[in-house]
Amino acid sequence: MVKSVVSTVHFDVMDLPFSRRGSWLAISWIKASHPTRHVPEGLYLRTVRDRGDYQQLFRIDLPADGGREIRAEASPSIMHLFPGGTKNERSGVVDVCIPTTSSVRFRGRGTLLRLSSIPGSELSYAIPRGEGSWIVNMLGAGLRLMLTPLRGKLHVDAPWQAQGSQPMRFEMHPDIAGEFDIVIEEFAQALTPNRLHPPFEDEAAAIEADFLAFAARHGGEGPFSETADIARYILWSCIVNPEGAITRPTVLATKDRLTGIWSWDHCFTALALCPGDPALAWNQIMTIFDHQDEFGALPDAVFDRRVVQNFTKPPVHGWAIGRMLKLGCLDRAMKEEAYLHLARWTDFWFSYRDYDGDGVPQYDHGNDSGWDNASPFILRPPLEAPDLATFLILQMDTLAVLADELERSKEAIAWREKSTAFLRLATSHLTRRGRMDFVVSGTHEEIPNESLLPYLQLLLGNRLTESTRTSLLKSLEEEGYITQWGIATESTLSRHYSSDGYWLGPIWAPSTFLMVDALFRSGENNLAKEIGSRFLDLVETSGFAENFDAITGAPLRERAFAWTASTYLILARDISARP
């Protein structure tokens, strides 16, 4: 009996890659306007390893109707492809699933399937394996694939040219009943062809069950459940198995272009995962800390093949782990690990990022702040920064809490004293015009700016003076930061504001979440809920983009970002729980 797989979650492959938990494979629509992509627009089978243009393994075409546009519809378990750009099964359909983390399966009726390689190294090749299977070695991607037809006929056009096969084209033709079925498996050195696969529907049903189990652990509240389902799909599908420098099961930033883990993105994802799956959330934190160096520094980002160590990211980790502690996500072993790593991370900033020796650490570059091109960094760094001081104060507070819970009472006292002393030093040292602001390390010249970054000091809540809080809140509401969609990263009145300027204006998930938390901590509950609700509305309208036009709400850059999905889920949960 044929099983029917029904999903309540559906999405557009034009916006979201089709993948599954654990897999390094995905199917994505690559747009002609996509930055840094140098391949023709179309639908591609990809690896999400760090391979640049070589991520694209095969372009997918359905040659029926003269090879016109493909229409794609997807759920977490199955993607349906229709030739001719219209949903009409009489013209043929190809169903796709990802039955294991290392394979993709295509089943078709009434159409052909064409897979075409992207021009690359002359050493890439295709050779017959026997039993109808072919082995494809893609040098640029660093992958070997086996194509095994389960039903129908595989036609191969891959002429040998001295040391390889370029170009390579594979076509699946239906059998006499008008159907075909083929599985593509990735492997390293050895794999035996297997023609005995479970029925397609059984494999799709198992995928759907895996997603539903994940979704059940990360349930949404309130009226946001439909979009929350997509958010949970993004998190589930962005998980990869450990490989290379990625040492644990980890949620990538996206399975679109930026397929790595950055050393502050991961905190927001961990917070979203924490209530439903503390172990996965902790892996999300530790994937970065596994690469903490001998000085205590964290890398900028981690990919499967490389660790980016020439930049870093801000110490938001104490703030994030402090929230995880309040959620009850960490067992004693996790707390021990957190304490040791956070202590070294904190010491790094005071020991190695304070070149003028004044006790106030600095950023060497905008990338180190996470806000790469924010307006304070238009002038030459190093810059001493209010957000950096704030994060270090909060990190020492979290270290004190951890020390208490680990029965390290003397260390807890020491961390609280250090936090209090640094708060006093930072506020006296950085305060200009009634608030902490950016200054040049060494000269302490003020850096005039209209960035949202200085407002993150509101995370200190009532530890700031009342006059400082009042001044910050007044300018936040009156000076062009708050729009109908949320909170801009640069005042919309600023001469540096740019609608698609990355950190020079667009709305981002992490800045929104940090500001919502800051406003709650400052007692501005109504404003916090209003900004959080506007962000939820923004995502409902424009999807899970990397960032958004602060004026129009239009989605910008990547379209399936995990920290946008994470922030959506956290805010939906937190705002609905607030009176």
Write out the residue ranges for each language-model feature:
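Short, ordered beta-strand-loop transition motifs
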Residues: 1, 96-102, 164, 174, ...
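Terminal accessory carbohydrate-recognition/targeting modules of carbohydrate-active enzymes
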Residues: 1-223, 256, 521, 562, ...
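The feature captures the catalytic groove of carbohydrate-active enzymes
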Residues: 171-196, 295, 300-316, 323, ...
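Extended, well-ordered alpha-helical scaffold segments
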Residues: 196-199, 203-206, 210, 223-230, ...
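Extended glycan-interaction surfaces of carbohydrate-active proteins
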Residues: 218-259, 284-307, 354-384, 421-507, ...
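Aromatic- and histidine-enriched alpha-helix N-cap/loop-to-helix transition segments
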Residues: 257-268, 276, 308-319, 337-341, ...
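Alpha-helical support elements that line or immediately flank enzyme active sites
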Residues: 260-291, 453-465, 512-525, 532
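Specific register positions within alpha-helical solenoid repeats of the TPR/Sel1-like families, i.e.
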Residues: 271-275, 319-326, 397, 404, ...
